[in-house]
């Protein structure tokens, strides 16, 4: 029978001889490709329909089948399974906004049937011009009129606290002499206590 000390030694040797497990390698992440900045946006279904109708130049309008063929031939990466439903929505939107119009031959058609034409672009509303404020006229004429009206009025007498009255007189040369404009001269009147009024020139 082997001793317990030998068994413990053999176990320690077997543990020491066992190979060490290598740590699991981390999976490398593949770098994501950056998206191209400013890439061209895909055209809308309505814009593709308008381009197809204008390119075909049919006066009586272009049929839905012809428009579909043109879109598939001139646009890459289009999902054909979703194109039919997208065209129906685009036709309804175009008729509502006035971008697309039905000719007389297919006036009774509805939905994505019949033929279509490009409608006239709605005119952009012009901005209303601001009304110019009228310029204020110089008030020189009004001032001159008011001054002339004041001159024509008869002069008023003004009483002073001392009982002195002032009155303006105008003088003009006689008819035989030289003509001069009216001259205005102010006079002061004062009535003495016991006698007639005396005149004093200012």
UniProtKB/Swiss-Prot annotation:
One annotated GO biological process: chromosome condensation
GO CC annotation terms, alphabetical: nucleosome; nucleus
Tissue: Sperm.
UniProt keywords, alphabetically: Chromosome, Developmental protein, Differentiation, DNA condensation, DNA-binding, Nucleosome core, Nucleus, Spermatogenesis
Highest rank taxon of the organism: Eukaryota
Domain H15: 41-120
Skewed-composition ranges (Low complexity): 177-187
Classification via Pfam families: Linker_histone (PF00538)
Keyword Secreted included in the entry's annotation: no
Biased segments, Basic residues type: 1-35, 126-156
Stretches the record annotates as Disordered: 1-46, 104-202
Predominant localisation class: nucleus
InterPro entries xref list: Histone_H1/H5_H15 (IPR005818), WH-like_DNA-bd_sf (IPR036388), WH_DNA-bd_sf (IPR036390)
Cellular compartments annotated: Nucleus; Chromosome
Keyword Amino-acid biosynthesis annotated: no
Post-translational modification: OE1 and OE3 are produced by post-translational cleavage of a common precursor.
Gene Ontology MF, one: DNA binding
Functional summary from the UniProt entry: Linker histones are implicated in chromatin remodeling and/or transcriptional regulation during spermiogenesis, the process of spermatid maturation into spermatozoa. Protamines substitute for histones in the chromatin of sperm during the haploid phase of spermatogenesis. They compact sperm DNA into a highly condensed, stable and inactive complex.
Name of the protein in question: Sperm-specific H1/protamine-like protein type 1
Species in which this protein is naturally found: Ostrea edulis
